[in-house]
Amino acid sequence: MKLLSAALLGAGLACSAANAETVLKLQTSTQSGAFEYTYVVDTWGPKLATMTGGEVKLEFTPINSIVDRGDTPEAVMGGVLQGDLTAVSYFTGRNPAFAILGDLIAGYDSVDQVQTFCRHGGGREILQELWDATLPGALHVVGCAAAAKEALVAKVPINGVADLEGVKIRSPSGLAATVFQKAGAAPVSMSLSDVFTSLEKGVIDAADASAYIN
């Protein structure tokens, strides 16, 4: 389960009152054909527009569509984007703590537990402190989201941990990659959009990628 995704806004935008017809452009961490992307575009975005009486509208874009997935914070700071809805595990290279908040392997049983931690257990505040330490005063954490349990697909039989030995597996960066490596696999970092062709061409043997619904 991808544990925490942060909706980030530039600090100035987050603190200002919304004007009529305010449109916020957000880049997501999912590709356009994924269920999660379709849901936020068709359901979540319109719901927010209705709740705000049309004052705030969200314009979502797929992963890597405007900037590289790892560069969204700077894009928000520079005004290219007004926010992002993305996996914070992408920022593990900036601070290892993002790996723990972003992809705590087997740490939660349900998305409700993730939301409870975020909203009532101090998770959002911890994530804000982490961003403040990384890019002081630049970004505001609006909230958290969680994806469902992800699929593990493979071209080779994997019936237990021992079968992971030597398997080239697409894995999120950070803690997930460390766990797979400790199990004997060879983690490979790549975008979800590259997973399908990489499996077909033998670039990877398996993939920890996306929710089952995709």
Language-model regions, residue ranges each:
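Sec/Tat signal peptide C-region and signal peptidase I cleavage site
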Residues: C15-A20
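Extracytoplasmic "Venus flytrap"
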Residues: K25-D42, I63-D68
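Short, polar/charged alpha-helical segment
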Residues: A34-E59, G174, T178-V179
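Contiguous mixed-secondary-structure segments that line small-molecule binding/active-site clefts
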Residues: D42-P46, A87-A186
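Alpha-to-beta junction loops
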Residues: G53-V56, T72-T86, A185-P187, K201-A209
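Short beta-strand-to-loop elements that line the ligand-binding cleft
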Residues: L58-V67, K168-S171, A185-S198
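Pocket-lining segment of extracytoplasmic ligand-binding domains
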Residues: V88, L175-A177, A186-N214
